[in-house]
């Protein structure tokens, strides 16, 4: 999976062909958005309601929000949703959608980075093999 396979976009921006498979990653359905504008809704990838409320009410800073959101991605239901996004990304481009206006301080950018930086996203490298041929003994 490469950076080109996963994009992010605000749900209120018009859909476009390059978006590929559009995945909404909010716990609540956004107002005014028709279901036809989204291919898949994975609410398990949205921040838990208490974390989002604390962040919006400024009881939690962005620096505190980030590790708490990422920790939430380790929940089994979130991991199942992440597996779905990875599967879709192997088939073609995926666009992660959210209602946040500021992409830099939004969970969609955190999720994209998580998907791209996670060991499961990296191509598997060939295993190191032992040298072939007769074994060499070390001299004492």
Where do the model's predicted regions map?
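Residues lining hydrophobic/aromatic ligand-binding pockets adjacent to catalytic sites
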Residues: 1-140
């Amino acid at each position: 999976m490469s950076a080109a396979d996963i994009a992010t976009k605000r749900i209120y921006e018009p859909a476009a062909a390059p978006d590929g498979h559009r995945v909404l990653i909010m716990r609540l359905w956004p107002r005014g958005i028709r279901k036809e504008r989204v291919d898949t809704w994975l609410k398990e990838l949205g921040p838990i309601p208490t974390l989002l409320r604390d962040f919006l009410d400024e009881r939690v800073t962005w620096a505190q929000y980030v590790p708490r959101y990422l920790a939430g991605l380790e929940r089994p239901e979130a991991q199942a949703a992440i597996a779905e996004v990875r599967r879709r990304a192997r088939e073609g481009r995926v666009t992660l959608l959210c209602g946040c206006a500021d992409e830099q301080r939004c969970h969609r950018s955190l999720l994209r980075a998580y998907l791209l930086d996670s060991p499961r996203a990296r191509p598997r490298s060939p295993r190191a093999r032992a040298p072939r041929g007769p074994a060499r003994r070390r001299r004492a």
